């Protein structure tokens, strides 16, 4: 009986000590925090003073120490102590004390340099480029190519081409190959739309093409359209082969069996 009483008292003492330690940990430390001697807000100028409410022994509405609307200690709208809108003590937008909104204090966060604005000319240019392709009735723009070296049969045209090849397109417009019955139809349509589009766009910029330019441009674009057709045909057949492979019954059964093993 005595041992049970002793054990109970030891348990009570342990719980009391544990509770006291927990309360000590939760007690605020002196010198910092909200409404204590240390300043937490960056906008304070007077040492040891806070903004909400001011220190000095007074409470809200007291004649000394700073209350709401009091002549001493610094309250809301007071001439001393540094309150909201005061000339001293460092409040919101104040010339002294530092750290207010737009002030010379070292902790101001409102004077950061503004982020650079998006260049709207670049955005508009990108949108316009997308509209050109979309406005051609389903035509796609191929990737850039190196302009082919072509011989035209005489030295004058060969030299003229080498000197002016940079004026000719290095990309072609085309539709998907499955919309054409053969390569000739694809190339014919590709050459017409590419030469027309390049001529109209370049003429709008103030540059004109001669008959020699058109002749050479058609030869250059024709070679690039043939290359584009070969690329698209190869990719099209590869996609078709993949679909046929994965749609065959043996492959479907194998995939189903593997899924069954993984899930099961």
From Swiss-Prot:
Main location as per UniProt: membrane
Assigned GO CC terms: Golgi apparatus; plasma membrane; side of membrane
Binding site for Cu(2+) 4: 96, 98-99
Sequence repeats: 54-62, 63-70, 71-78, 79-86, 87-94, 95-103
Residues that carry a glycan: 192, 208
InterPro entries reported for this sequence: Prion, Prion/Doppel_b-ribbon_dom_sf, Prion/Doppel_prot_b-ribbon_dom, Prion_copper_b_octapeptide, Prion_N
Keyword Plastid part of the UniProt annotation: no
Residues holding Cu(2+) 1: 72-74
Matches recorded under Pfam families: Prion (PF00377), Prion_bPrPp (PF11587), Prion_octapep (PF03991)
Signal peptide positions on this chain: 1-24
Disulfide bonding pattern of the chain: 190-225
Molecular function terms, GO-annotated: copper ion binding
SMART domains: PRP
Membrane topology recorded in Swiss-Prot or TrEMBL: Lipid-anchor; GPI-anchor
6 X 8 AA tandem repeats of P-H-G-G-G-W-G-Q: annotated segments: 54-103
Binding locations of Cu(2+) 3: 88-90
Domain writeup: The normal, monomeric form has a mainly alpha-helical structure. The disease-associated, protease-resistant form forms amyloid fibrils containing a cross-beta spine, formed by a steric zipper of superposed beta-strands. Disease mutations may favor intermolecular contacts via short beta strands, and may thereby trigger oligomerization.
Disease note: Found in high quantity in the brain of humans and animals infected with degenerative neurological diseases such as kuru, Creutzfeldt-Jakob disease (CJD), Gerstmann-Straussler syndrome (GSS), scrapie, bovine spongiform encephalopathy (BSE), transmissible mink encephalopathy (TME), etc.
Function summary: Its primary physiological function is unclear. Has cytoprotective activity against internal or environmental stresses. May play a role in neuronal development and synaptic plasticity. May be required for neuronal myelin sheath maintenance. May play a role in iron uptake and iron homeostasis. Soluble oligomers are toxic to cultured neuroblastoma cells and induce apoptosis (in vitro). Association with GPC1 (via its heparan sulfate chains) targets PRNP to lipid rafts. Also provides Cu(2+) or Zn(2+) for the ascorbate-mediated GPC1 deaminase degradation of its heparan sulfate side chains.
The protein's name in its UniProt record: Major prion protein
Lineage, broadest ranks: Eukaryota, Metazoa, Chordata, Craniata, Vertebrata
Gene: PRNP
């Amino acid at each position: 009986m005595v041992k049970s009483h002793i054990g109970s008292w030891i348990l009570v003492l342990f719980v009391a000590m544990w509770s006291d330690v927990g309360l000590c940990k939760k007690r605020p430390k002196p010198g910092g925090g909200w409404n204590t001697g240390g300043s937490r807000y960056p906008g304070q100028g007077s040492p040891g003073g806070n903004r909400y409410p001011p220190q000095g022994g007074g409470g809200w509405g007291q004649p000394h120490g700073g209350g709401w609307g009091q002549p001493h200690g610094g309250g809301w709208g007071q001439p001393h102590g540094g309150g909201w809108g005061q000339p001293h003590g460092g409040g919101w937008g104040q010339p002294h004390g530092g750290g207010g909104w737009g002030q010379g204090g070292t902790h101001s966060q409102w004077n950061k340099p503004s982020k650079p604005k998006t260049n709207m000319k670049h955005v508009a240019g990108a949108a316009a480029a997308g509209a050109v392709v979309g406005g051609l009735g389903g035509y796609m723009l191929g990737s850039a190519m190196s302009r082919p070296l072509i011989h035209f049969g005489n030295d004058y045209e060969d030299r003229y081409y080498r000197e002016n090849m940079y004026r000719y397109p290095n990309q072609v417009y085309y539709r998907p190959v499955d919309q054409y019955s053969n390569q000739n139809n694809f190339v014919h349509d590709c050459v017409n739309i590419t030469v027309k589009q390049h001529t109209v766009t370049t003429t709008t910029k103030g540059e004109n093409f001669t008959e020699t330019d058109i002749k050479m441009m058609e030869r250059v674009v024709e070679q690039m359209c043939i290359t584009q057709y070969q690329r698209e045909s190869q990719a099209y057949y590869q996609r078709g082969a993949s679909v046929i492979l994965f749609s065959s019954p043996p492959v479907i059964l194998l995939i189903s069996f593997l899924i069954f093993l993984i899930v099961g």
